Amino acid sequence: DSEFAELKIRGKIFKLPILKASIGEDVIDISRVSAEADCFTYDPGFMSTASCQSTITYIDGDKGILRHRGYDIKDLAEKSDFLEVAYLLIYGELPSGEQYNNFTKQVAHHSLVNERLHYLFQTFCSSSHPMAIMLAAVGSLSAFYPDLLNFKEADYELTAIRMIAKIPTIAAMSYKYSIGQPFIYPDNSLDFTENFLHMMFATPCTKYKVNPIIKNALNKIFILHADHEQNASTSTVRIAGSSGANPFACISTGIASLWGPAHGGANEVVINMLKEIGSSEYIPKYIAKAKDKNDPFRLMGFGHRIYKNYDPRAAVLKETCKEVLKELGQLDNNPLLQIAIELEAIALKDEYFIERKLYPNVDFYSGIIYKAMGIPSQMFTVLFAIARTVGWMAQWKEMHEDPEQKISRPR
């Protein structure tokens, strides 16, 4: 039987359908409130508003649970590779061996970008941030695929594959241009993560030998960042897509949203904070500053809009961080890691943080891993974009396949 919630406005009662969720909280359908009650609902930041129906990702923030298509994020990070998870998000199921091989071949086939794109890079000054270059380059792909300006359902999967394939190439090109080195072409004999590292660190005169520990760590990071419900950048992609904008334009809007320091740029801010703290002996001083309402200092890498428990992604990254630093001989002498571990230990025992349910989030350890890998801080958000493109494309595809999809237009 249908359930309803009752809303009383100026003495009149309105029955609002309660929509049953397959998992998690049920939802009150308020779509007819404005027409029937002559009122709008007000929810700044969409704190209590579901903007769409989705079967891609589920989060229980109180319990620290994150699942993609029903699979726990920790299992995916430990047992899958990134393109398996990409397939899962886009198609709804993990691939068979044959499906996986076909999918990876398609991604490899589409990894090259048009040579004319090189001219676009040359219009940027040498000091340009790689995110600025990437944002422009991804948007410009619309010019190379004019057929997708009026895309059809048959294009959804091929478009997703093209985007997943080309984003790492553009990301590496953005980095190479920013440091004045020649672009490195993709090598289809390498897997997805190896290929990206190759394009980042090889030069025409020097081959880059991929360390398997580094590769596996980056693979986990990509998986952990692949999708995360209707966050700011994903919602931006959906809103842009709801107007019928071409997929390259939609993804470029997601990149723009991700660039913000409150979203994808947070791990770079964490690194800067750890550097500012400087030494474990100063941690109590900065803990006190974080508690002081009159002090602008914020303890970055703690707390999350959704999670009121330990972020499951942070738990995986903490162990991954130790594995990488051990492999590189930095486990006992990396000052940023030592500060981070002690800062976490102190904060988790402090009543101020316990009462407010402020736990380490995914940004707390990822930057330390990147720095150890030799990835500069201005590339952190670029790597986030590589991973999140998979989620953006899965969400974009799901939106266009939804018969109830409408153009987004908040009041």
UniProtKB/Swiss-Prot annotation:
GO molecular function: citrate (Si)-synthase activity
InterPro entries per UniProt: Citrate_synth-like_lrg_a-sub, Citrate_synth-like_sm_a-sub, Citrate_synthase, Citrate_synthase_AS, Citrate_synthase_bac-typ, Citrate_synthase_sf, Citrate_synthase_typ-I
SUPFAM superfamilies: Citrate synthase
EC number(s) on file: 2.3.3.16
Reactions catalysed, as given in the entry: oxaloacetate + acetyl-CoA + H2O = citrate + CoA + H(+)
UniProt keyword annotations, A-Z: Transferase, Tricarboxylic acid cycle
Catalytic class of the enzyme: transferase
Miscellaneous: Citrate synthase is found in nearly all cells capable of oxidative metabolism.
Residues at the catalytic site: 304, 363
Entry's Gene Ontology BP terms: tricarboxylic acid cycle
Protein name: Citrate synthase
A Gene Ontology term for the protein's cellular component: cytoplasm
Source organism (scientific name): Rickettsia massiliae
Pathway: Carbohydrate metabolism; tricarboxylic acid cycle; isocitrate from oxaloacetate: step 1/2
Family named by the database record: Belongs to the citrate synthase family.
